[in-house]
Amino acid sequence: MTPAAFKRSIRDLQVWCSSCMVALSGSDPIGVLIGAKRPSGTLVHKIAVHPAHRRQGHARHLLASLSSKLAILGPPRIIAEVPETLASACELFRASGYVQEALLTDYVFSSPGDFVPPTPSDASASAKAAADLAGRFVIPVTVDDLAANGLLGETHPQVWMRSVETLTARKDDIAGLAVASDERIEAHLLYVKPGIGLEGSAEAGPPASPLPVEIVSLRTFVEDDGDRLKQLLSRLGAQGMEPFRFPKVHPAEISKELLETLGFRPAGVHRLYAARARSDSSSFQS
């Protein structure tokens, strides 16, 4: 993590210095924990120990110290979103008393330009879908637009990096599209503007190869088998923004079946671990 990325995480994720810790061996730093804190809880954003000092209990001590502090200062809920591929990190949280609450799936849409919606079983179904979208418009939207219409509420579980607080903090980095009728917004898609990432900035210059467009919100408010979301994805793909990446999707946020209908496929998993802070540093309460 670079100094610039750390500064951005303070703004975007609400990293608190009081929730950050360093383990020392003499005067040498050998471990670090970076925590982000909101009224709902604390996220263990980063935890790492120098390779020469692993398997000596330093990481567990950092977690226990954070727990003891939060037992006094609050909030008591502590979470971590750990890549499933990091087996040692998953074991660390399990051994420290954390309980797995959910699997968060990374989805990719590798070729929006080649996307072809599933063919309806008969002509009447195709005609119904076309009629349902008649009189609707695809319009640009912002985070502020959705907030003003009450469409950014915490109606379902969201991961830290795509929570309302993060979207609001990053609103200048985020653009969006929506399907709207004369009366309301019926579906929307928010994405990070190309060239900007959570741990980078537009000033850093373009990458050596195109990066996936990161989707940070994908919602429909109409039962239409995903037709409105397909329209938004097709519009975004037509603008040359591809491929798409939709990270850390909670199973209660949007169904796997709908995402597969839209053309997404799973590409990775994070484990969501949680515990409650306790002043007794030797154990956690799930």
Regions found by a protein language model. Give the residues of each.
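Conserved active-site alpha-helix within GNAT-family acetyltransferase domains
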Residues: 60, 84-103, 250-268
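Conserved acetyl-CoA-binding loop-helix of GNAT-fold acetyltransferases
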Residues: 49, 55-68, 95, 222-238
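Conserved acetyl-CoA binding element of GNAT-fold acetyltransferases
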Residues: 40-52, 198-224
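Conserved GNAT acetyl-CoA-binding A-motif
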Residues: 70-83, 239-250
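A short helix-loop-beta-strand connector motif used in the catalytic cores of GNAT acetyltransferases and
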Residues: 8-22, 28-31, 43, 165-178, ...
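Active-site-proximal cofactor/substrate-binding loop regions of enzyme domains
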Residues: 1-66
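Structural motif
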Residues: 82-83, 192-194, 217-223, 246-252
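Amide-forming acyltransferase catalytic core, primarily the GNAT-like/NAT-type
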Residues: 1-3, 95-209
